[in-house]
Design a protein with these regions (language model features):
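Hydrophobic alpha-helical membrane segments of integral membrane proteins
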Residues: 114-118, 161
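Helix-terminus/linker motif at the lipid-water interface of multi-pass membrane proteins
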Residues: 1, 5, 69-76, 132-136, ...
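Residue-level hotspots within pore-lining transmembrane alpha-helices
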Residues: 12-16, 56, 60, 90, ...
Length: 345
């Protein structure tokens, strides 16, 4: 049930990412054409439109959170924790939406460093907040030194609260940099309307809707897979989840190259440099396939060590290694789909 809730979270996550991308691509086109004034206008409209969208998504998520574990066929013993986890996540969807929007806008303006640094910070903060919120006050031993670590002892609630607090801090930093420091997109102190225009929304829908349906299809398939795997028992579910998490070592570089491809191709299209656009498309797709192919080979070889770090249970290890090695063969073609997706957006 917790795994199913995670899949629904990814679906919501994908919807927010798609909504942000619908405006980010338009900004990339305007920047490529040298029209920074229009780029800022689109950004202002994007803030309002995406906040409305994510708020509606949040309300829907909160409304279904109570029944979600039942629909996913989860064990009754963890229904309450699963519902609570998803409900808190849904409540903070507007913050996640602004994070996606600000990060996408900065990347499409050519700034990859700031979003990357802030998202790395978010991961670190997530670990720190979880350390203090999940567990109660306890004695901890690090490198032979024993000390008392304070803790809230909130369990599952602490896990999701740590995540959303990390999101809030990162979103604040991302929006501050975008609105006040970005050379191309800062608009604080400038006059402008935040009311979305019909033409901007129309273009956004044309870009976002296919992406949104794609995310729904992928996450729907993952949820269906979870429902199928669930009757096989906890070992099968855990092995499948650990293998998917380990596989992210491969496809995270692919998503990074995909973001770069969207920026390079979008700005080239805005500048009407079609030959350069095609060169960037070819370079990024082949680079993604090469890198993820190498990463796939590495995780195939290191699968026992990778899964071994994640769980001490021998049954889960054995099954997880098999799953991870099967997934490794798909990485080059998976890379092609990920990066080509960024190109065609």
């Amino acid at each position: 049930s917790l795994v199913g809730s995670e899949m629904c979270i990814r679906d919501s996550w994908g919807g927010c990412a798609a909504a942000a991308m619908g405006f980010s691509v338009q900004v990339a086109h305007r920047i490529g054409a040298g029209d920074f004034v229009e780029a800022k206008k689109i950004l202002r409209q994007a803030v309002t439109a995406t906040l409305v969208f994510s708020s509606l998504l949040a309300v829907g998520g909160i409304c279904i959170s109570g029944m979600l574990p039942l629909w996913l066929g989860g064990d009754e013993a963890i229904w309450n924790d699963s519902s609570l986890y998803f409900r808190i996540f849904a409540l903070f969807l507007p913050a996640l939406q602004l994070n996606f929007l600000a990060g996408g806008m900065l990347r499409c303006s050519g700034n990859m460093r700031v979003p990357a640094m802030l998202n790395i910070m978010m991961c670190l903060l997530d670990v720190v907040f979880n350390f203090f919120l999940i567990f109660p006050t306890r004695h901890v031993e690090w490198f032979g030194v024993v000390f008392t670590a304070p803790g809230a002892g909130l369990g599952v609630k602490g896990a999701i609260l740590g995540t959303v607090l990390a999101e809030l801090v990162t979103t604040g930093g991302m929006m501050w940099y975008l609105c006040r420091r970005s050379p191309m997109l800062k608009f604080v102190g400038e006059r402008g309307s935040f009311l979305p225009k019909r033409e901007t929304l129309r273009k956004s829908f044309r870009i976002s809707l296919p992406m949104g349906f794609e995310h729904m299809a992928i996450c729907g398939a993952q949820i269906a897979t979870t429902v199928v795997v669930a009757p096989l028992g906890i070992v099968a579910i855990a092995a499948n989840s650990f293998a998917i998490i380990a596989e992210s070592l491969c496809y995270m570089p692919g998503y990074g190259i995909s973001e770069a491809a969207t920026t390079l191709v979008g700005q080239s299209l805005g500048a009407n440099r079609i030959r350069l656009l095609r060169r960037f498309a070819n370079i990024t797709v082949w680079s993604g396939m090469l890198i993820m192919g190498v990463m796939g080979a590495l995780i195939y070889v290191a699968a026992p060590q990778i899964i071994g770090v994640m769980t001490p249970v021998e049954e889960i290890r054995t099954l997880g290694i098999e799953i991870l090695r099967i997934e490794a063969f798909a990485e080059p073609m998976f890379a092609a789909s990920i990066v080509a997706y960024g190109v065609f957006v």
